């Protein structure tokens, strides 16, 4: 699968529309089975027009796609719920929020084998936007306690259906968990990639990382949000990864725009991953867990 993140496109003003070219180029090179946009996709102007452009690209390619909401995705003309509802009706979009928990676009997508059995899981979650406890607590949003409970229940259900063995899983959302900094600072296992800005995670930690460790299904999480970071590290052997920023007009000295590839391996708790830049260059190839052994 191919992760793009933080496109910040506005087709009405022409802002960052070159991101469409980046997406098409990298899709042509990598030929993924699924594209995931991890937030801050259509952040101002008329998001419906922008998402229709994404729909046209993926429809032409016959490419299934998924969107997680970023903190900026509800700052245009639509609320987060309206964005989530709109996405579910677009061609090839797999978003399927059943309204089971706090936030919007929280769902699990099972990856099935040729015999139609669940072999892996993709968790898609809304990491929300901004603190709901201002002015006492500032900063970014965090997973609500009900979302942590929802994840635990979904993991438990799929584990029970698999003879009480956790299925290999990965999770996509926008804002990094607080534990990302610990993965970067891990002195025993060096992260792969670049960290050019401080992790902008939430001030409040509601325990999603701990829940995933306890459930033993999630191998790694993949986020965006911090445009200048593209590393993958481990914390307690769970991979914590950034995608590569896909927008063309970004702040500071961000890396060349691109996307992150994740290749799951049927029947194994392992995945390959790398960054593909718009110029065609492949950087930071690695395998979890083999590349992260102490």
Model-flagged regions — what are they?
Residues 108-116, 208-215, 229-294:
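Binuclear metal-dependent phosphoesterase catalytic core
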Residues 6, 23, 35, 40, ...:
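Divalent metal-coordination and catalytic microenvironments
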Residues 31-33, 121-124, 136-230:
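His/acidic metal-ligating clusters that form di-metal
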């Amino acid at each position: 699968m191919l992760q793009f993140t933080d496109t910040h496109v506005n087709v009405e003003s022409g802002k960052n529309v070159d991101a469409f070219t980046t997406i098409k180029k990298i899709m042509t090179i990598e030929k993924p089975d699924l594209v995931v946009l991890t937030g801050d996709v259509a952040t101002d102007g008329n998001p419906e027009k922008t998402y229709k452009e994404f729909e046209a690209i993926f429809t032409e390619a016959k490419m299934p796609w998924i969107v997680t909401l970023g903190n900026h995705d509800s700052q245009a003309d639509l609320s987060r719920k309206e964005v989530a509802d709109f996405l579910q009706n677009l061609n090839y979009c797999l978003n399927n929020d059943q309204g089971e928990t706090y936030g919007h676009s929280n769902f699990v997508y099972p990856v099935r084998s040729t015999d139609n059995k669940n072999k892996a899981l993709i968790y898609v979650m809304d990491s929300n936007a901004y603190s709901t406890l201002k002015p006492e607590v500032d900063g970014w949003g965090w997973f609500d306690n009900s979302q942590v409970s929802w994840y635990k229940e979904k993991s438990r259900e799929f584990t029970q259906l698999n003879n009480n063995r956790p299925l290999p899983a990965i999770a996509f959302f926008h804002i990094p968990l607080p534990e990302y900094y610990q993965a970067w600072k891990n002195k025993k296992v060096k992260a792969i990639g670049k960290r050019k800005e401080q992790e902008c995670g939430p001030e409040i930690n509601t325990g999603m990382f701990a829940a995933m460790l306890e459930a033993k299904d999630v191998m790694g999480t993949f986020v965006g949000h911090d445009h200048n970071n593209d590393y993958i590290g481990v914390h307690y052997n769970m991979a914590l990864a950034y995608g590569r920023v896909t927008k063309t007009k970004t702040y500071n000295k961000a890396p060349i725009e691109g996307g992150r590839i994740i290749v799951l391996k049927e029947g194994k708790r392992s995945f390959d991953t790398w960054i593909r830049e718009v110029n065609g260059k492949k950087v930071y190839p690695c395998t979890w867990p083999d590349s992260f052994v102490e």
